[in-house]
Amino acid sequence: MRLPWERQPLFYRHDPSSSPSSIGYDGPRISPQFPVGPLREAVVGLAETPRRWFWQVWGCSNSRENLNRIGGEPCWVQDAEYPRCPTCDSVMAFLLELDSNLPTTDGGEWLWGSGGIAYGFWCDLCGVSGFLWQCT
């Protein structure tokens, strides 16, 4: 059986208070085979990215570049993959991406697959978020 997060993309509808509810998955709650602790709390800041980093190539970063971002253009591990909103069928806007190797509370690191990137998207018309990840 495939885990819910292996079915891509995952979609969530957000109510007026921003609380999410899953769209398209009503199966049982499943635990991962290799569980990992929650992400470690961190203080983050936003900074305008210099034009030089507008486009980044995942294959050239070698874990030396910050591939976590809000807005801008995604840094695709594979081919570009913009999901369509399951409610209105519009192409969803890119919202954010999170790179692998994020520290967890149990001393480990969070990996998207074998060390890829997770991408978040948003449909403002429907209040729907979409998430997918890519790895090699």
What function would you assign to each model-found segment?
Residues 1-136:
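Preference for intrinsically disordered or flexible, low-complexity segments
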